[in-house]
Amino acid sequence: CFNLYSSKHISACAIPRVKVDDKPEPFKNATSILNWWSSIEQRSIELSLKYRYMFMTDITNCFGQINPESISWALARKDTPHETNENEELASNIRHYLRAMQEGRNIGIPQGSALFSLIAEIILGYADMLLAKEICECQKNGSLPEDLEYDVLRYVDDYRIFCNDSEALDKISYMLQHILERFNFRMHSSKTRTSYELITDSIKPDKAFYIFNTPIVSKQTYLEEDGKERKVPGYDFDGFQKHLLFIYEFSRRFPNSGQLVRQLEEFSKRVETQL
């Protein structure tokens, strides 16, 4: 099912995963958090090296607005080259049990269960298929450049669309909006925008605030070596990437400053000590 939903330019990053071992996670939802970090944050930063613009949005009350009828459309892959009627009985059973669970309520699905996350992913994956199909048709009829480069990352109901052509990006975002409306979905107005600061906006706002407001300065740490204590430089963040993000934000506010040069020199020394 999910293999058919895959597209060269559209990546579904929240397909439910199963741990390969029985070891307990170090903290709740560790697998999901790591998946978000690698497939959304890190991939977005990678794409920022290729693209100039990023459209960001998410769906308002996604699970609560799901139309159960769309389960049938998704499992049938309606209006796509892979349309099938093999899953009619499965779709009917899912809708039946959903109505029973919700005392006849015919809109929305429960949230918080891996099963319902899977159902939502099937529906949103089908929406990805429709978006890829519509973009392809627009490239064929000339309303979008045939050689258009773009990438779409979706993590459940969180979308990021990357492109170097601002007009094409607007068209793709409108296509997405119209497709989502067919599923009774609405874009969250306060979270919908086009970003020109792809590096900083690739990171969740709370995490970015923490990074940019925690000073990464040299401090003295005592370590024992050969029975002796010595002072070595230490840093508030262990990882190089967060250190670089701090320097990047500092350079935006104070370009060509002496402090910026000093921070770059300190970072260079830090890298040298690890080589």
Where are these regions (language model features)?
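Helical (often loop-to-helix) elements that flank the catalytic cores of nucleotide-handling enzymes
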Residues: F162-M187
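Short, glycine/acidic-rich hinge or "gate" loops at secondary-structure transitions
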Residues: Y5-C13, E83-N93, C136-L153, H188-T194
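Conserved two-metal-ion catalytic palm core of "right-hand" nucleic acid polymerases
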Residues: C1-Q111
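Amphipathic alpha-helical scaffolding segments
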Residues: E69-P81, G125-M129, M175-L180, S195
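Active-site palm subdomain of RNA-directed nucleic acid polymerases
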Residues: E83, L118-V156, I161-K171
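Short, flexible loop/turn elements at secondary-structure junctions
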Residues: I59-F63, I123, C163-D165, T194, ...
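Right-hand nucleic-acid polymerase module
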Residues: S39, I45, Y53, T57, ...
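Conserved catalytic core of two-metal-ion nucleotidyltransferases
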Residues: E181-P215
